[in-house]
């Protein structure tokens, strides 16, 4: 396992690690398999890479718009970065894409707000979330705005992320004497369910790994183009 701030420094070097951590806390709670459905809701989040990929493929086939991975990159941004679903669920690759989107938002915001670093950063958060500099500041009854949530997470305690470590010729002492561990059966490649009423305040019912995605008769919500554009120069976001 790798500390998130270390991973962020390696994979998203143009964004301050604590800034990236605040966004990730709000977007996915540091869950690399998270999927956020626009106009819908998964009754539970995928618990494995296979399940996450299958769920994303099922949602795409049914015309749903969604964001995925640790930084919740919108599906329509994946072709821009040459990313597959499997790659988008990789924490490092997802952070890299998310940081480029945020970087572009910040670049455009600071042009509009010269000398206002923190103001431009908050505008960039709005851009990351809504694709513009205003949508992320809007509040809902009883709920803070997206920008307020990110700012409130500035001192979040980050979680370590599981990644494959570098091989070493000398094994760990414990590994050299450890008995083989019985492998768990892999998760079903079926995806999880979608609840079309995300406004409900009650907790979603727990789905089952072997249940296919079931959608009601409503059509997926139509949305504007996803936020973020590719960048050309190196800009550090604070």
Swiss-Prot record:
Keywords: Virulence. It holds the Pfam family SLT. The keyword NAD does not apply. Signal peptide: none annotated. Residues 198-209 have a biased composition (Polar residues). The keyword Flavoprotein does not apply. Residues 197-238 are annotated as: Disordered. Transcription is turned on at the beginning of the stationary phase of vegetative growth. The virB operon is essential for intracellular survival and is not involved in the invasion process. Constitutes a major determinant of virulence in mice. Belongs to the virb1 family. This is Type IV secretion system protein virB1. The gene is virB1.
């Amino acid at each position: 396992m790798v500390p998130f701030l270390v991973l962020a420094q390696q994979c998203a070097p143009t964004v301050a690690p604590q800034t990236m951590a605040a966004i990730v806390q709000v977007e996915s709670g540091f869950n690399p398999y998270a999927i956020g459905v626009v106009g819908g809701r998964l009754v539970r989040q995928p618990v494995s890479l296979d399940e996450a990929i299958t769920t994303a493929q099922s949602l795409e086939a049914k015309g749903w718009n969604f964001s995925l991975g640790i930084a919740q990159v919108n599906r329509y941004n994946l072709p821009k970065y040459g990313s597959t679903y499997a790659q988008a669920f990789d924490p490092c690759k997802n952070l890299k894409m998310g940081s480029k989107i945020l970087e572009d938002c910040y670049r455009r915001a600071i042009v509009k707000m010269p000398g206002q670093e923190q103001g431009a950063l908050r505008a960039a958060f709005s851009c990351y979330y809504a694709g513009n500099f205003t949508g992320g500041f809007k509040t809902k009854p009883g709920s803070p705005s997206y920008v307020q949530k990110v700012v409130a997470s500035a001192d979040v305690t980050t979680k370590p992320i599981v990644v494959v470590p570098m091989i070493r010729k000398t094994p760990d002492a414990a590994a050299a004497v450890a008995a083989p561990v019985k492998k768990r059966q892999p998760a079903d490649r079926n995806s999880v369910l979608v609840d079309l009423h995300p406004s409900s305040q009650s907790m979603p019912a727990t789905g089952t790994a072997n249940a296919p995605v079931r959608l009601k008769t409503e059509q997926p919500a139509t949305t504007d183009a996803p936020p973020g554009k590719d960048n050309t120069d190196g800009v550090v976001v604070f």
